[in-house]
């Protein structure tokens, strides 16, 4: 077992979909090794209470509610990009699922650079693989040929702010 304390990166973290937080209700989730209370007031503003601290910045964007985490209590230094498709009637509404992943979120972004796992894990051995890290974003493009998922696969993934 590791005796080091959990550390969480600085950045925006999604707490849930906007519709998960109706007016007048308070939801409780666990994150950052704390109980987090999320409330939407009668004037539709979201507040977040992390172990009695209500100063955490909150953002509603792309139909998600996010909270800014920074151990040094610095203000946010970026805002995620607005995704126009989240507000378009051309797309159906999306859902969100929550499940426990027993590792630190920093390890998830490491997956982006591990091109060797795509064959054995996803049954999609890569043919082309490209990554770019710029400011708070990480973009990956990959081409693959999978007998299960289909030929000539193309994937573009973009991650913003922590993992």
Feature annotation, model-predicted:
Residues 1-49, 54-61, 67-69:
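N-terminal pre-ligand scaffold of iron-sulfur
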């Amino acid at each position: 077992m590791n005796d080091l304390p959990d550390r969480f990166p600085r950045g925006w973290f999604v707490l849930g979909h906007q519709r998960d937080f109706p007016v007048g209700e308070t939801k409780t989730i666990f994150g950052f090794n704390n109980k987090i209370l999320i409330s939407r007031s009668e004037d539709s503003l979201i507040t977040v209470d992390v172990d009695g601290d209500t100063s955490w910045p909150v953002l509603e964007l792309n139909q998600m509610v996010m909270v800014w985490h920074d151990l040094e209590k610095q203000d946010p230094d970026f805002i995620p990009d607005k995704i126009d498709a989240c507000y378009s009637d051309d797309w159906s509404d999306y859902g969100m699922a929550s499940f426990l992943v027993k590792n630190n979120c920093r390890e998830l972004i490491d997956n982006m650079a591990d091109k060797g796992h795509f064959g054995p894990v996803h049954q999609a051995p890569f043919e082309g693989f490209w990554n770019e890290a710029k400011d708070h974003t990480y973009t990956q493009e990959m081409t693959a040929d999978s007998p299960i998922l289909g030929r000539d696969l193309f994937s573009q993934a973009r991650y913003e702010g922590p993992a």
